[in-house]
Design a protein with these regions (language model features):
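N-terminal leader/targeting pre-sequences
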Residues: 1-118
Length: 118
C-alpha cells in the first residue's frame, strides 16, 4: 500500500457507507471506502465545541445500531453500544477511530483493518 493507492480509491470509487452528522451545532459527513482488507474513513465536521483550555477532543467511533434515533428519554437508544467484536475496553473497540479536534472545519482521514465494509 502506498499513499497514491489511497488517493486513487478516494477519487475513483464511491463510498460503501456514509453517515450524515447532524446536531444542534455540529454538522458533517462520514464516508467509508473499502480498501485492501480494511476501511478508509473520511470525516468532515464543523461546529465541534472547544473547551476553556483550547481545542476540544471528541471521540469518534462506530456504533452497533442502525440509526442515531430513539425516544425522548433515550434520544440515541437505537445507536446501541460501541461496535466491538472483542471484549476489549474503550479505546480498543473494533469501531474506535482516531479522535476529532474542534476547529472551524475538521477533516479526518484514517485507515483501519479493524473492520471491513462489504
Amino acid at each position: 500500500m502506498n499513499s497514491f493507492d489511497l488517493i486513487r480509491v478516494l477519487c475513483n470509487t464511491s463510498p460503501k457507507a456514509y453517515a450524515l452528522i447532524t446536531g444542534a451545532t455540529v454538522t458533517g459527513t462520514m464516508l467509508a471506502y473499502s480498501f485492501e482488507e480494511g476501511t478508509i474513513v473520511v470525516v468532515e465536521a464543523q461546529g465541534l465545541p472547544a473547551t476553556g483550555c483550547g481545542l476540544g477532543v471528541h471521540g469518534l467511533h462506530i456504533h452497533e445500531g442502525s440509526s442515531c434515533s430513539g425516544t425522548p428519554e433515550n434520544p440515541f437508544g437505537n445507536a446501541g453500544g460501541h461496535y466491538s467484536t472483542t471484549n476489549c475496553p474503550h479505546p480498543y473497540h473494533t469501531g474506535d477511530l482516531p479522535p476529532l479536534f474542534s476547529a472551524i472545519i475538521v477533516n479526518s482521514f484514517s485507515f483501519t483493518r479493524s473492520f471491513a465494509i462489504s
